[in-house]
Amino acid sequence: MQVSVENTSALERRMTIAVPAERVENEVNKRLQQTAKRAKIAGFRPGKVPMNVIRQRFEADARQEAFGDLVQASFYEAIVEQKLNPAGAPAVEPKSFEKGKDLEFVAIFEVFPEFTVSGLESINVERLSAEVADADLDNMLEVLRKQNTRFEAVERAAQNDDQVNIDFVGKVDGEVFAGGSAKGTQLVLGSGRMIPGFEDGLVGAKAGEERVVNVTFPEDYQNLDLAGKAAEFTITVNSVSAPVLPELNEEFFAQFGIKESTLEGFRAEVRKNMERELRQAIKTKVKNQVMDGLLAANPIEVPKALLENEVNRLRVQAVQQFGGNIKPEQLPVELFEEQAKRRVVLGLIVAEVVKQFELKPDDAKVREMIEEMASAYQEPEQVIAWYYKNDQQLNEVRSVVLEEQVVDTVLQKATVTDKSVSYEDAVKPAEAPAAAE
């Protein structure tokens, strides 16, 4: 078999392959012999049909089948021989497939980039440290109480944070407009759910009162027909309800699946969850900085096939997440290109770090991570057992642990600055990660 390779770009290869005619004819004859054993042709007993008849009837199909199989087999043999690592399926261009001649075809494909990860010493990482103070815990308890607020009807005038039940009719230029009317709407004043001025116009209103509120739709309002226009809403207040925060008692604790009957026990459980969240937030911020540093220090070209695959995967993911009657291919590629490129480049760089430093998932760290996740459940031992019985889930944890080991490897060579911050600053969402160039 003859093979020649042309580098048409940094990652694209144009490979010409010639398969000897003898091998081609052997493959064709092999298929014809198999066909002869099972062919049913009038006037002949099964398995007794003369080969010239078989060849006349089935040679074209046998040759086409042999072509497909030989292209696949010889392409694989060629990339092994040439030590190439394709990043996707090849585009095949037949050149010659005449009877008695060599089979010639061209395979065009991309290869994975070959590179060595470098510049780890140039990466700067700010590693945060924080503690869950009593004040942080108190704030969290108030947040939990507010999330479980109930409303009780009152006979006073409405004020911010009250919930009102309203009917309303909106008009623009004296005409009722689509989507501008509703009945029985529950609205918490001050929530910012309605357009500016609407909720303010109900402060001071009582149950049974009708008010006319004049507002202007924002210039950037999603409905372009209404953007920037003045509107008049006639609003009837059906009821006014005041917020009532739940007591910190056993009934409240039970809503969170916590069996503790004392405030001290509940606070201890909440603190434990906050500390878990804190550890994860700090770890995530360190990881993002490491990944950004790896990207900046190792600019690499990415195979188009990998990018296309990742874009398509993100499209499918978006449709599954947001639903709607839309097909993944209808979503613009531009929406996902930047994210897809970052993920593909990081995937290649992380894989190379694993290879260069000969990293393998640490079983002790795998166990530690599973125990950490299981601690959030009431029956942690059952969760741990489930992970170790489920190969797919266990492998996912092993992948995460391996990625953490990559981060640890980089941190050993990077410049790391430790900084103490408040709990609030530590758990604050990080800025969007940098895009791959």
Curated annotation (Swiss-Prot):
<keyword id="KW-0697">Rotamase</keyword>
<keyword id="KW-0413">Isomerase</keyword>
<dbReference type="InterPro" id="IPR036611">
    <property type="entry name" value="Trigger_fac_ribosome-bd_sf"/>
</dbReference>
<dbReference type="GO" id="GO:0005737">
    <property type="term" value="C:cytoplasm"/>
</dbReference>
<keyword id="KW-0963">Cytoplasm</keyword>
<keyword id="KW-0131">Cell cycle</keyword>
<dbReference type="InterPro" id="IPR027304">
    <property type="entry name" value="Trigger_fact/SurA_dom_sf"/>
</dbReference>
<dbReference type="InterPro" id="IPR046357">
    <property type="entry name" value="PPIase_dom_sf"/>
</dbReference>
<dbReference type="GO" id="GO:0051083">
    <property type="term" value="P:'de novo' cotranslational protein folding"/>
</dbReference>
<dbReference type="InterPro" id="IPR008881">
    <property type="entry name" value="Trigger_fac_ribosome-bd_bac"/>
</dbReference>
<keyword id="KW-0132">Cell division</keyword>
<comment type="similarity">
    <text>Belongs to the FKBP-type PPIase family. Tig subfamily.</text>
</comment>
<dbReference type="InterPro" id="IPR001179">
    <property type="entry name" value="PPIase_FKBP_dom"/>
</dbReference>
<dbReference type="Pfam" id="PF05697">
    <property type="entry name" value="Trigger_N"/>
</dbReference>
<dbReference type="GO" id="GO:0043335">
    <property type="term" value="P:protein unfolding"/>
</dbReference>
<dbReference type="GO" id="GO:0051301">
    <property type="term" value="P:cell division"/>
</dbReference>
<dbReference type="Pfam" id="PF00254">
    <property type="entry name" value="FKBP_C"/>
</dbReference>
<feature type="domain" description="PPIase FKBP-type">
    <location>
        <begin position="161"/>
        <end position="246"/>
    </location>
</feature>
<comment type="function">
    <text>Involved in protein export. Acts as a chaperone by maintaining the newly synthesized protein in an open conformation. Functions as a peptidyl-prolyl cis-trans isomerase.</text>
</comment>
<dbReference type="InterPro" id="IPR008880">
    <property type="entry name" value="Trigger_fac_C"/>
</dbReference>
<dbReference type="GO" id="GO:0015031">
    <property type="term" value="P:protein transport"/>
</dbReference>
<dbReference type="InterPro" id="IPR005215">
    <property type="entry name" value="Trig_fac"/>
</dbReference>
<dbReference type="GO" id="GO:0003755">
    <property type="term" value="F:peptidyl-prolyl cis-trans isomerase activity"/>
</dbReference>
<keyword id="KW-0143">Chaperone</keyword>
<dbReference type="GO" id="GO:0043022">
    <property type="term" value="F:ribosome binding"/>
</dbReference>
<dbReference type="GO" id="GO:0044183">
    <property type="term" value="F:protein folding chaperone"/>
</dbReference>
<protein>
    <recommendedName>
        <fullName>Trigger factor</fullName>
        <ecNumber>5.2.1.8</ecNumber>
    </recommendedName>
</protein>
<dbReference type="GO" id="GO:0061077">
    <property type="term" value="P:chaperone-mediated protein folding"/>
</dbReference>
<dbReference type="Pfam" id="PF05698">
    <property type="entry name" value="Trigger_C"/>
</dbReference>
<dbReference type="InterPro" id="IPR037041">
    <property type="entry name" value="Trigger_fac_C_sf"/>
</dbReference>
